[in-house]
Design a protein with these regions (language model features):
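Recognizes extended acidic, P/S/T-rich segments that occur
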Residues: 1-10
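Beta-strand-rich modules
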Residues: 9-24
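Short, conserved beta-strand segments of beta-strand-rich sandwich/propeller modules, principally
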Residues: 14-18, 157, 255-257
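Extracellular fibronectin type III
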Residues: 22-40
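Aromatic (Trp/Tyr/Phe) and Gly/Pro-enriched flexible surface segments
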Residues: 34-155, 186-198, 204-295
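A short beta-strand element within beta-rich, extracytoplasmic domains
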Residues: 154-164
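Extended, low-complexity, turn-rich repeat/linker tracts enriched in Gly/Pro/Ser/Thr and Asp/Glu
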Residues: 164-171, 183-188, 201-204
Length: 295
């Protein structure tokens, strides 16, 4: 069987090809066959330059995008500390920053883990930025998050830059798995960045670990990739470039949604992390055209 790989094709373009064969005496040419390359959808506000404040809450979106779409492609933990009962706390752990940037003249996303409290009631809050939407608070214990935004393209990796200062973990949630070996006051915090292409959205209740997404085994995951934990450490005040390869389970199933999650404290879902952890993200982009990695 003959196989060929074509590179450098233009996205969303129809091509025609014929197969040509010669046995030395005669030449054979097949009928023309056409195919259309997929759309290479860009990441919404991947450069992190657009920020809009709705009420007390900051979003990584332009005012025009937010108004036209009734919300932002990116959400964060901000609604949990600026809306409803969270409005008493009134802090935005995730905001735009125009000083600490990778590209001059733009902005970055600043994610600052902190202890959010009001009237003596509070929780450790890892700053986050994710493709999805904040759903609701779960009393004073946590929140429900809807992960995933509509997306049908198939990139091969996520590329970008981050800058991270890891504090020493000073809050350990009661439901933190013991096998993580985390010791308050001793274990350094780590950040996290991961991406998934899926065939559905997911609602996670961070007070109920049974709702957490199993990216390795869930049938709705088409492709997944994460920044290795060994790279999720302090960058010594420097910007660090990263590339996360998407590992595809199959090339026959097309995704319907994309999930990207970034957090200044990897175990923030368990209310575990450091109030000294600070992360910046900038110039995120989806890369297309490479040979896809199969799991």
């Amino acid at each position: 069987m003959f196989k060929a790989t074509l590179k450098g094709l233009t996205p969303n373009t129809t091509y025609s090809y014929r197969l040509k064969y010669s046995d030395g005496t005669e030449e054979y040419i097949s009928d023309a066959v056409s195919f259309t390359t997929e759309v290479a959808t860009a990441l919404v506000n991947g450069n992190m330059d657009d920020w809009y404040q709705s009420g007390k809450t900051w979003y990584a979106a332009s005012e025009g995008y937010f108004t036209e779409n009734g919300g932002s492609f990116w959400d964060s933990s901000n609604p949990g500390t600026t809306t409803g009962a969270g409005a008493l706390v009134n802090v935005n752990p995730t905001q735009g920053n125009s000083v600490t940037v990778h590209t001059a003249g733009g902005k970055s996303a600043e994610l600052k883990s902190q202890y959010a409290s009001a009237f003596g009631i509070g929780k450790f809050a890892a700053a986050s930025l994710y493709a999805g939407s904040f759903n609701s608070l779960v009393g004073t214990n946590g929140a429900k998050i809807d992960f995933g935004q509509p997306f049908t393209s198939r990139p091969t990796r996520l590329h970008g830059f981050f800058r991270y200062t890891a504090g020493t973990i000073d809050y350990v949630g009661s439901n933190t798995p013991s096998n993580l070996g985390i010791i308050s006051g001793s274990t350094p915090d780590v950040c996290s960045i991961y991406i998934a292409l899926t065939t559905r959205t997911y609602q996670v209740d961070n007070t109920d670990t049974s709702t957490f997404i199993d990216y390795e085994n869930d049938s709705g995951i088409v492709a997944y990739g994460e920044l290795p934990v060994s790279e999720c450490v302090s960058t010594d005040g420097l910007w660090k470039e990263f590339n996360i390869d998407l590992k595809y389970r199959t090339l026959t199933t097309k995704p319907t949604h994309i999930i990207i999650v970034c957090s200044s404290s990897k175990y923030g879902d368990y209310f575990t992390g450091s109030t000294g952890s600070l992360m910046y993200l900038d110039d995120l982009e989806l890369v297309y055209g490479d040979t896809p990695t199969l799991k």
